[in-house]
Amino acid sequence: DFEKKYFNYPIINTTFIGHPVFHIKKRIKKNNYKYISFLLGSRENEINKLFDYFDKLEQYISSNKINYHIFIPTLPHLVDIIKFRTRNWKTVTFISSEIDLFDKYYDDVFISITCSGTASLEIAKRNIPQVVIYKLNFTTELILRHLVKVKNACLLNIISEKMIIPEVVNSQLTNRNL
């Protein structure tokens, strides 16, 4: 029913056929974890828009000697871009586009900082705590504020019609708030 509400228009007939997130297994909770995952987005413009926030988080982790490594799962065409952007990070960072290895690393993730989108569903399905972030350009945010009826950016918050997953988005996304 969720899809019908948002994607079924009088002149366009739509059918929901499933999503790969349903095949993801919930991870087993444990006492010690090795990673904080950074899900930077699946498009280069998302990475460019959000990278400074991830960079500040890495600086916080390294300067406060927080005992976690960073795991960045990504797509093959983004690996070199991310490696270049993270080249000066002091925190041990593992960047991978090898989907077969993701579950191994996700099993060891303490918390995820997740770009809003399908990734938030994948992290939630794995039972990993997360904070969702996103930033529209200022003009787009102003226009959409009056046109869009949903209050949240995270898909799970939209579906449930309440804040389940913490999110810091748009004008609320500042280094201080994050």
Model-inferred region functions:
Residues 1-178:
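Nucleotide-activated sugar donor-binding and catalytic core shared by glycosyltransferases
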